[in-house]
């Protein structure tokens, strides 16, 4: 079944981890054998596995922050440096387009063309992967007026924060609302028609942003606080607010977001027997709050700076997303519900935003 993944850090992996994503994931692991570092030799995501799992369309990020305090990856001392990093990431996406492996989706016509390509019944082996460009954390936007330049480059979604104190917002691990420039940024996103990604926002920033922003909203990779008590997840009150706005939440496969008590860098999937099917618990929780299956989708974050040491033990690569439809069917979800979760709900929001 065609799958839309609402959050992949593809360019981060290509440039920060030096991974040629045209190669199979297992070949990338082989090449990293003997190297050290989080996620090294354990990557799950590459183009061949995306094609095999029918992950034909995705949201692909740019990521370069100026977050206060040291961060292990993609964090810079100035917005100018961060902007330059995002431009390098954009250049990589363009190089993959020129090589026939990706195709950027900027408008409704582009979206419909990619959906048609991936549902034409032909083999997927050589199909380009369609991507909607998103920015995870707005620190690289040098000024509010600078956002339009990113829009012209095809940026269609953005989350104002990542971790900690960011230039325009506070991350989920902080307490407080949007500063004045953050409110201006959200207003400019609204004017341009950009999608607001509320993932990673502090609770205060979340509520401020929803009050200001009138356009299309999603949470690209967020799970349920009722199941995993942590500010990184959304409370039922927040989920209900997103449902009332017609939003969709992408379910993430980062292990510490799936079950309570996970200690990053210490707990291993085999220690707690974490299975892929646990993500259906989060999906079902959102569906129960909504009374339907119209507000949840897939947003794996599978390549977000970690690997199989921080994913379900029965997940080898992103191709395993193809097992989720059967898991949903066993829970009583209809074929239409499953199609909506795997791709239809996010497609609906994209059609709304890209019209």
Q: Each PLM stretch: what is its role?
A:
Residues 1-180, 229-355:
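N-terminal hydrophobic targeting/anchoring segments and the immediately downstream early-domain regions
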Residues 3-10, 201, 219-222:
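Histidine-centered catalytic micro-motifs
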Residues 175-211, 216-221:
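Loop-centered beta-sheet repeat module
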Residues 201, 222-224, 252-256:
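Histidine- and/or cysteine-centered catalytic micro-motif in compact active-site loops
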Residues 205-245:
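Aromatic-anchored, glycine/proline-accented short structural segments
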């Amino acid at each position: 079944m065609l799958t839309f993944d609402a959050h992949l850090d593809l360019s981060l992996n290509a440039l920060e981890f030096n991974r040629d994503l045209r190669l199979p994931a297992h070949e990338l692991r082989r090449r990293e054998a003997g190297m050290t570092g989080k996620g090294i030799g354990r990557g799950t995501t590459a183009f061949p596995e995306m094609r095999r799992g029918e992950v034909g369309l995705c949201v692909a990020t740019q990521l370069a922050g100026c977050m206060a305090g040291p961060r292990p990856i993609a964090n810079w001392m100035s917005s100018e440096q961060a902007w330059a990093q995002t431009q390098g990431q954009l250049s990589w996406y363009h190089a993959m387009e020129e090589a026939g492996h990706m195709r950027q989706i900027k408008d409704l016509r582009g979206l419909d063309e990619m959906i048609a390509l991936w549902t034409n019944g032909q083999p997927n082996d050589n199909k380009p992967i369609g991507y909607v460009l998103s920015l995870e954390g707005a620190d690289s936007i040098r000024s509010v007026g600078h956002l339009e330049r990113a829009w012209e480059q095809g940026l269609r979604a953005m989350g104002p924060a990542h971790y900690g104190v960011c230039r325009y917002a506070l991350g989920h691990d902080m307490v407080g609302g949007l500063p004045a420039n953050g409110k201006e940024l959200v207003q400019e996103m609204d004017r341009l028609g950009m999608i607001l990604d509320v993932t990673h926002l502090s609770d205060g920033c979340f509520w401020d942003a929803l009050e200001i922003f009138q356009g299309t909203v999603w949470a690209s990779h967020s799970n349920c606080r009722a199941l995993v008590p942590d500010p990184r997840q959304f409370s039922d009150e927040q989920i209900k607010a997103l449902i009332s706005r017609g939003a969709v939440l992408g379910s993430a496969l980062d292990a510490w977001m799936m079950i309570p008590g996970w200690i990053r860098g210490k707990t291993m999937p085999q220690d707690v027997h974490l299975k892929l099917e646990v993500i259906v618990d989060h999906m079902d929780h959102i569906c129960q709050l909504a009374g339907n299956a119209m507000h949840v989708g897939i947003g794996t974050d599978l390549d977000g700076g970690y690997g199989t040491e921080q994913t379900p033990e029965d997940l080898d690569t992103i191709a395993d997303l193809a097992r989720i439809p059967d898991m949903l069917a066993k829970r009583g979800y209809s074929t239409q519900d499953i199609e909506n979760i795997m791709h239809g709900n996010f497609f609906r929001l994209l059609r709304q935003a890209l019209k």
